[in-house]
Amino acid sequence: MFGLWDSYPVAPGYALVIPRRHVSSLFEATSEEQAELLEVLTAVRSKVLEAHSDIAGFNIGVNDGRAAGQTVNHLHIQLIPRYAGDHPDPTGGVRHVIPGKANYLRA
């Protein structure tokens, strides 16, 4: 497993965690590999926070399958830093990928 800065970051500090063994899906990784992915993800998060002290939160994502937006056929976990004010209303987070599903809270 290893972490690296994304070549096309959507935000400063955007990083990836990637297994060395080829698997397309998180569900193809062994339980040991899944545990190691989380350990490396935690270490990468620490490095990202050292480099960008103004981070207010993170989105952590895996696009698993073409319908989910996977364009690289190799498992990678995306660590996307979020900054105060970077989106007018972040409520709903990744639910925004499906139109009309982000606002699930009732007044």
Where are these regions (language model features)?
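HIT superfamily nucleotide-processing domains
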Residues: 1-107
